């Protein structure tokens, strides 16, 4: 492993989804988008639902949907413990669009029944948008 890389492991409750040497990653933290480069300061933080962008050697990129979880950065090792982690090819675009549409419909009909309901609906929208973004990025990356 060179000075310009580090080892990344992405695991979910179901399985290990990625393990290997990378140049950098980009993920959505609780404070917003963050990049992790070699030599990053040690860190432990929560991550929000979104797309994990992995840049491997020779600038090859891979994208994974993360539904939230924990990011741990150590000296030469980064670990993501995800609630759910899904590769783009495992997603169903039609189902993701339907989920987004249903959540948007619920939010339009929201009548202050409960703050928890509102939080769940907005979370569902965020997850559906992230899945659709992942599929879009993967398609775009194939044609480059």
Curated annotation (Swiss-Prot):
Tell me the protein family, please: Belongs to the ATPase epsilon chain family.
Q: Which organism is it from?
A: Blochmanniella pennsylvanica (strain BPEN)
Instruction: Kindly report the protein's main subcellular placement as a broad class.
Output: membrane
Assembly and partners?
A: F-type ATPases have 2 components, CF(1) - the catalytic core - and CF(0) - the membrane proton channel. CF(1) has five subunits: alpha(3), beta(3), gamma(1), delta(1), epsilon(1). CF(0) has three main subunits: a, b and c.
Quote the subcellular location field of this record: Cell inner membrane
Q: What is this protein called?
A: ATP synthase epsilon chain
Membrane topology annotation: Peripheral membrane protein
Query: Molecular function terms in GO for this entry?
Result: ATP binding; proton-transporting ATP synthase activity, rotational mechanism
Q: Which residues form the signal peptide?
A: none
């Amino acid at each position: 492993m060179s000075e310009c890389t580090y080892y990344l492991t992405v695991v979910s409750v179901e399985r290990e989804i990625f393990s290997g040497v990378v140049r950098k990653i980009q993920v959505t933290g609780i404070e917003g988008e963050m990049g992790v480069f070699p030599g990053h300061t040690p860190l432990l933080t929560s991550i929000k639902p979104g797309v994990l962008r992995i840049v491997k050697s020779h600038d090859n990129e891979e994208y994974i949907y993360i539904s939230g979880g924990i990011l741990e950065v150590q000296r030469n090792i980064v670990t993501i413990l995800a609630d759910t982690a899904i590769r783009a090819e495992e997603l169903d675009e039609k189902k993701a669009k339907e989920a987004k549409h249903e959540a948007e419909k619920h939010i339009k009909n929201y009548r202050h029944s409960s703050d928890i309901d509102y939080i769940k609906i907005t979370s569902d929208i965020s997850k559906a948008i992230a899945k659709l973004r992942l599929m879009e990025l993967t398609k775009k990356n194939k044609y480059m």
